[in-house]
């Protein structure tokens, strides 16, 4: 539909609304639907015509008109509510005198109506409602996209999610499934004796991750504050305080780029368990993913973007170092040592900075050559200490940490490790991060003196993990982009377009 035609229809609908206003308030607020379309269909669709006629089932529903076929003295209307669609059959003789011609025929597709009637089946066997009363509840001023073309423009779907949800059943199901997944996650951790907590979203020091933060200003306190990039340091303060198992479903903010995997505002589940190791959390993570699969699909097997995953099987597990060698058969261990790793990275087009150590260079090689090849669920372990400022060093090799990341479908889904609870060691690592920030690394962490003070009281041996819920939902809804699983993803401003 052209903009000119669309504007013409809007003008026509506004004229109808003006006439309705003259007769009273057209936005009725006293209709109480007693039924949902899908419930009616599930309960009565198998009934015969004769059985329905004998039962004389009275129903009332409310929803949006999605289709309207006027055939003289009778009409068929499809009404859509939150559960689905059902057909209404409306005849002139069943309604008050003159109502059919003077009011019903003036209703438009997109209008929200309330209707009451009796169930019956049409000549072709479609369960329908024979309407005895229908009321306009809300007048739609903008026409919906054409039925057979729908809302096909991807950017418009993201910008006008409200229209996408009206027109696209797949989108509605995606967000219902997202809610189901988050509910399952909460129940999972509650059932494993974790306590759900809430920590500050406005922080004086952004910490818990290597990322750029959003800065704001607190007027009353006259001080800069930051939207959190992660809740980690606050959650570990709670471990110090004796809350041995905590989790938070958190909104995090990172002032970084947009992509099919990244949105500046995103949701995570972070959880921390005292007297546990990163191996314990790897086992717990497998159990969580298996449970989500069964809850969503009734099976451990799911399909995502051309790949099949069986969550009943143990996840693969390999170290950062070994994975680089496995996926780069032309390289040897010698290629990844202090003398040669920089040359390998530069051959790959990586711009190696002067302050990068061997660990950082190895991770850059890993991200460039391995990450996207990790299709089946895989734990990557033994991350270099240099890129893991909050993780516990490995007892046998201080160059690496007791850390893992989980990759599925070529992207990181989770990050966990045994926590560093040595206050002096953590202070030294913070100082190193400050040096890197002073050397123009915008993502390096700041020194958090209060967190060090908390560690000085003593934090028990602890393991913690963060799982990206948006990416998790992408996986379990077979969605190719993070924008498909965010109701209102961030977009460039329409102003000036």
From Swiss-Prot:
The keyword Magnesium applies. GO terms for cellular component: cytosol. It catalyses: tRNA(Lys) + L-lysine + ATP = L-lysyl-tRNA(Lys) + AMP + diphosphate. Disulfide bonds: none annotated. Mg(2+) 2 binds at residue 412. Its EC number is 6.1.1.6. Keywords: Aminoacyl-tRNA synthetase, ATP-binding, Cytoplasm, Ligase, Magnesium, Metal-binding, Nucleotide-binding, Protein biosynthesis. It is an enzyme of class 6 (ligase). It is found in: Cytoplasm. Binds 3 Mg(2+) ions per subunit. PROSITE patterns: AA_TRNA_LIGASE_II. InterPro entries: Aa-tRNA-synt_II, aa-tRNA-synth_II, aa-tRNA-synth_II/BPL/LPL, Lys-tRNA-ligase_II, Lys-tRNA-ligase_II_N, Lys-tRNA-synth_II_C, NA-bd_OB-fold, NA-bd_OB_tRNA. One of its GO terms (biological process) is lysyl-tRNA aminoacylation. The keyword Chloroplast does not apply. Its main location: cytoplasm. Its cofactor is Mg(2+). Pfam families: tRNA-synt_2, tRNA_anti-codon. Mg(2+) 1 binds at residues 405, 412. One of its GO terms (molecular function) is ATP binding. Homodimer. Belongs to the class-II aminoacyl-tRNA synthetase family. This is Lysine--tRNA ligase. It comes from Ruthia magnifica subsp. Calyptogena magnifica. The gene is lysS.
């Amino acid at each position: 539909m052209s903009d000119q035609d669309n504007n013409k229809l809007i003008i026509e609908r506004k004229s109808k609304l003006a006439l309705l206003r003259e007769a009273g308030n057209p936005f009725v607020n006293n209709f109480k639907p007693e039924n949902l379309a899908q419930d009616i269909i599930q309960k009565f669709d198998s009934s015969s015509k004769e059985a329905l006629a004998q039962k004389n089932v009275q129903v009332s529903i409310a929803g949006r008109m999605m289709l309207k076929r006027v055939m003289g003295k009778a009409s068929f209307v499809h009404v859509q509510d939150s559960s689905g669609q059902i057909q209404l059959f409306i005849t002139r003789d069943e309604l008050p005198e003159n109502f059919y011609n003077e009011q019903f025929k003036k209703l438009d597709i997109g209008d929200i109506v309330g209707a009451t009637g009796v169930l019956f089946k049409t000549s072709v066997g479609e369960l329908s409602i024979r309407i005895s009363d229908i009321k306009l509840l809300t007048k739609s001023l903008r026409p919906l996209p054409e039925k057979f073309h729908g809302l096909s423009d991807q950017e418009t779907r993201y910008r006008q999610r409200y229209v996408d949800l009206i027109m696209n059943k797949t989108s509605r199901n995606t967000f219902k499934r997202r809610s189901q997944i988050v509910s399952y996650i909460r129940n999972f951790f509650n059932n494993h004796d974790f306590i759900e907590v809430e920590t500050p979203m406005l922080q004086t020091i952004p910490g818990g991750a290597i990322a750029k933060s959003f800065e704001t200003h607190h007027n009353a306190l006259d001080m800069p504050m930051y939207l959190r990039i992660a809740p980690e340091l606050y959650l570990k303060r709670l471990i110090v305080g004796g809350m041995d198992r905590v989790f938070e479903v958190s909104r995090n903010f990172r002032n970084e780029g947009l992509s099919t995997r990244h949105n500046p505002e995103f949701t995570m589940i972070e959880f921390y368990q005292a007297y546990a190791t990163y191996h314990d959390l790897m086992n717990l993570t497998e159990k969580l993913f298996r449970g989500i699969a069964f809850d969503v699909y009734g099976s451990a097997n799911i399909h995502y973007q051309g790949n099949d995953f069986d969550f009943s099987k143990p996840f693969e597990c390999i170290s950062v170092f070994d994975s680089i060698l496995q996926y780069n058969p032309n390289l040897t261990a010698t290629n990844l040592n202090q003398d040669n790793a920089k040359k390998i990275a530069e051959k790959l087009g990586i711009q190696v900075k002067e302050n990068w150590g061997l660990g950082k260079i190895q991770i850059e090689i890993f991200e460039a050559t391995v990450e996207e090849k990790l299709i089946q669920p895989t734990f990557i372990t033994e991350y270099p200490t240099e890129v893991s400022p909050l993780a516990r060093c490995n007892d046998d090799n201080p160059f690496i940490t007791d850390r893992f990341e989980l990759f599925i479908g070529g992207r990181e889904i989770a990050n966990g490790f045994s926590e560093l609870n040595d206050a002096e060691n953590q202070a030294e690592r913070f100082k190193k991060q400050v040096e890197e920030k002073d050397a123009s690394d915008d993502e390096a962490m700041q020194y958090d003196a209060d967190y060090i003070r908390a560690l000085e009281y003593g934090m028990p041996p602890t393991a913690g993990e963060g799982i990206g819920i948006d990416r998790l939902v992408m996986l379990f809804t077979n969605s190719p982009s993070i924008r498909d699983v965010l109701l209102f993803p961030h977009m460039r401003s329409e102003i000036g377009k």
